[in-house]
């Protein structure tokens, strides 16, 4: 994955403003729309050390994550006092396993993850520059089982007013990336003038949006 050094440096210097200390409230609010079953396999690309993994593992028997940063993966297990089984995989990745959770370290585009019934993307697509997003979407579609669903959280703001990441990914681009899939907007949270992205960054508008993407 390109820009690897950028993300390695972020974790190494603990510049992880994108990390949430709690479960993202949008996950429990909208997960039901994926029609989840306990036996559904869930994949979380570019998962970091997200608390969302813990929440998902209470709902599903198999939750997979992929994370470039070894620092993030080790921190995730250490902070929860989990002792994972660590297995080297093909010289490029390591697999960390504990109960329902399996996290691959390394490049998402080459990680040997299993296909999933549901993919949860809160911070992956918006972390990638525009020139990488088509490749990412193709990889996601490749990893989705027939009848699979994606719960996508994205951002929408004038890209020329702020350099990412996180980047703006408007609905038009989502529909283009997932052409042939059913794309449903579940929620648009439009920021007011007190939101830090508007108050501090000076953006003219900023919204966090939730989409359900279904294979037809």
From Swiss-Prot:
<dbReference type="GO" id="GO:0010038">
    <property type="term" value="P:response to metal ion"/>
</dbReference>
<dbReference type="Pfam" id="PF05724">
    <property type="entry name" value="TPMT"/>
</dbReference>
<keyword id="KW-0489">Methyltransferase</keyword>
<dbReference type="GO" id="GO:0032259">
    <property type="term" value="P:methylation"/>
</dbReference>
<dbReference type="InterPro" id="IPR008854">
    <property type="entry name" value="TPMT"/>
</dbReference>
<dbReference type="InterPro" id="IPR022474">
    <property type="entry name" value="Thiopur_S-MeTfrase_Se/Te_detox"/>
</dbReference>
<feature type="binding site">
    <location>
        <position position="46"/>
    </location>
    <ligand>
        <name>S-adenosyl-L-methionine</name>
    </ligand>
</feature>
<comment type="similarity">
    <text>Belongs to the class I-like SAM-binding methyltransferase superfamily. TPMT family.</text>
</comment>
<dbReference type="GO" id="GO:0008119">
    <property type="term" value="F:thiopurine S-methyltransferase activity"/>
</dbReference>
<feature type="binding site">
    <location>
        <position position="67"/>
    </location>
    <ligand>
        <name>S-adenosyl-L-methionine</name>
    </ligand>
</feature>
<dbReference type="GO" id="GO:0005737">
    <property type="term" value="C:cytoplasm"/>
</dbReference>
<keyword id="KW-0963">Cytoplasm</keyword>
<protein>
    <recommendedName>
        <fullName>Thiopurine S-methyltransferase</fullName>
        <ecNumber>2.1.1.67</ecNumber>
    </recommendedName>
</protein>
<keyword id="KW-0949">S-adenosyl-L-methionine</keyword>
<keyword id="KW-0808">Transferase</keyword>
<dbReference type="InterPro" id="IPR029063">
    <property type="entry name" value="SAM-dependent_MTases_sf"/>
</dbReference>
<feature type="binding site">
    <location>
        <position position="122"/>
    </location>
    <ligand>
        <name>S-adenosyl-L-methionine</name>
    </ligand>
</feature>
<feature type="binding site">
    <location>
        <position position="11"/>
    </location>
    <ligand>
        <name>S-adenosyl-L-methionine</name>
    </ligand>
</feature>
<dbReference type="InterPro" id="IPR025835">
    <property type="entry name" value="Thiopurine_S-MeTrfase"/>
</dbReference>
